Amino acid sequence: MALNLRKNHPILKIINDSLVDLPTPSNISAWWNFGSLLGICLMTQIITGLLLAMHYTADTTLAFSSVAHMCRNVQFGWLIRNLHANGASFFFICIYLHIGRGFYYGSYLNKETWNIGVILPPTLMATAFVGYVLPWGQMSFWGATVITNLFSAIPYIGQTLVEWAWGGFSVDNPTLTRFFALHFLLLFVTVGLTLVHLTFLHETGSNNPLGIPSDCDKIPFHPYYSIKDMLGFALMLILLATMALFSPNLLGDPENFTPANPLVTPPHIKPEWYFLFAYAILRSIPNKLGGVLALAASVLVLFLVPLLHKSKQRSMTFRPLLPFLFWTLVANLLILTWVGSQPVEHPFIIIGQVASFTYFTXILVLFPIASVLENKMLNL
């Protein structure tokens, strides 16, 4: 009998077990497409980022000009830059939807997969933040100044830490060069974590919309889900291309078309849209250290989700109260995102404070209480 290379070759076997013969639940919906879409986003960012790095100069006097040169004189440089900038937005859209799906369907009960997954968004946020500084526009410079300054809230070592991160007494050339190095380095951290995430996922297998064991009804990943994923890739890449070609600056800040000037502060310093919910939580607490802790907690609170699962059912599909609370949380996050983009004045301050309080209360208090109530209602 001929040797099946796909199943016996040490390297091809790993690929085969992950993408071809992987036993997959037969009923997973389009919400399960976002994992593979994140993989495509990562590949797109690596390719476009590498091409941009070939033309970029990490120096305060040349960075802005090198980006302008890229868009004017490099073959399709404008397109590569637009794909990279908007690709980051699509990356965050996909990761937020992916987390939301895991939250709704109880995928967080695969604890190892979930915990590695929760480390990924902060890594991605750090990567996007240092990347945003590289074009050295006004918002790049002032965003870097404001966010790195948050580390000074750490007692005793804060100020030293900030000056060490800056490589001087303000954001300047050493900061830019190290941020370029970090942007490149964090990419590999992201890739490594992604592989660990996938390894843990394939240990347990995928969850499904019903939240019940699916061992009795599994189908091979290829051709069923490989085709389904390809449809997802096509749709997302069409959307990304449309955005990059028709409205590339829709999500950017006009302030970043002005070269960085330490002597002129922009009227509203705000990060990219995908950080606004966390930025709103940071701003809603008047104390600096408290704000920084709340900012960290806004993402790291996801580590507690498996511990707060009190329901006898895994998924929210058939639960009477939880879907309502879940969509309230989604609306709350949208309100936080909107508030983060507004100036710090009445009524936005109080709206941000209420929304921040509701965000943590919903996850830490209301979800567990509602789960216990449901168990009582359904006599479980």
From Swiss-Prot:
Record-listed heme b b562 binding positions: H84, H183
Encoding gene, per UniProt annotation: MT-CYB
Q: What is this protein called?
A: Cytochrome b
Primary subcellular site in the record, as a coarse category? mitochondrion
Species, as recorded: Gymnorhina tibicen
Summarize where a ubiquinone binds, as residue positions: H202
Query: Where does the chain cross the membrane?
Result: 34-54, 78-99, 114-134, 179-199, 227-247, 289-309, 321-341, 348-368
Required cofactor(s):
heme b
The UniProt subunit note reads as follows:
The cytochrome bc1 complex contains 11 subunits: 3 respiratory subunits (MT-CYB, CYC1 and UQCRFS1), 2 core proteins (UQCRC1 and UQCRC2) and 6 low-molecular weight proteins (UQCRH/QCR6, UQCRB/QCR7, UQCRQ/QCR8, UQCR10/QCR9, UQCR11/QCR10 and a cleavage product of UQCRFS1). This cytochrome bc1 complex then forms a dimer.
Q: Which InterPro entries match?
A: Cyt_b/b6_C, Cyt_b/b6_C_sf, Cyt_b/b6_N, Cytb/b6-like_sf, Cytochrome_b, Cytochrome_b_C_euk/bac, Cytochrome_b_N_euk/bac, Di-haem_cyt_TM
PROSITE patterns to which the protein is assigned, alphabetical = CYTB_CTER (PS51003), CYTB_NTER (PS51002)
